[in-house]
A protein has these predicted regions:
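Conserved loop/turn at the beginning of each blade in beta-propeller domains
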Residues: 67, 134-135
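Beta-propeller and closely related beta-sheet repeat lectin domains
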Residues: 72, 139-140
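Residue position within the beta-strands of beta-propeller blades
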Residues: 91, 150-153
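Conserved catalytic network of the ASCE P-loop NTPase/AAA+ motor domain
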Residues: 143
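Beta-propeller domain segments
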Residues: 1-129, 146, 158-180
């Protein structure tokens, strides 16, 4: 991220962990036999903590999403959106046809809403809820204008049980309307 958001005047460069640390696992946790040891004294900026209730594993906050799901199409909803969603992110969550770590556990196939919170230590956390489900496998979200968003689906089965007779993907329109 430092190549996108450079440190401000007088700030030290930030290190987000790669390749020494992934998510919220400590740098000493070697994910792979070839994972290098972190240089001594290197401080990492931890990722955003996902407080859930959606997208977490084992009921615990995590710095990622569930196993076997992937975030897609991150969109900020600012002015022009109803108060319930204004100043939040929406992110597609592409499901996998591999079950999660729990028995009969599926993840993804939805759009998540992420409400950001600044924590006392200056880090960020997100309250993540399922916003739109079930979907096929959302692969992108495209804001067209304030109050209008398109969601692109890859295919339309919404769980691992409906593998037969897949329908082609589709484009969904999400439109904010005024209350009467």
């Amino acid at each position: 991220m430092d190549h996108i958001v450079p440190p401000g005047s007088g700030e030290e460069p930030r290190h987000h962990g790669f390749p020494y640390q992934f998510g919220d696992k400590p740098a000493g946790h070697a994910w792979y036999p070839h994972t290098p040891a972190a240089p001594p004294g290197l401080k990492f900026i931890l990722p955003v903590l996902n407080l859930g209730p959606a997208g977490i594993m084992y009921g615990q906050p995590t710095s990622t999403f569930n196993a076997h799901s992937s975030p897609t199409g991150l969109v900020w909803l600012g002015a022009g959106w109803p108060e319930a969603v204004r100043d939040t992110f929406l992110v597609g969550r592409l499901g996998s046809f591999v079950m999660g770590p729990g028995a009969d556990e599926e993840h993804g196939f939805d759009v998540l809403q992420m409400r950001m919170e600044r924590r006392a230590d200056g880090s960020w956390a997100a309250r993540t809820t399922s916003f739109l489900a079930p979907l096929g496998r959302p692969i992108d979200l495209l804001p067209a204008r304030p109050g209008l968003l398109y969601i692109l689906e890859y295919t339309r089965p919404t769980d691992l049980k409906g593998r037969a007779g897949w329908l082609p993907g589709r484009v969904l329109e999400l439109r904010a309307t005024a209350k009467n």
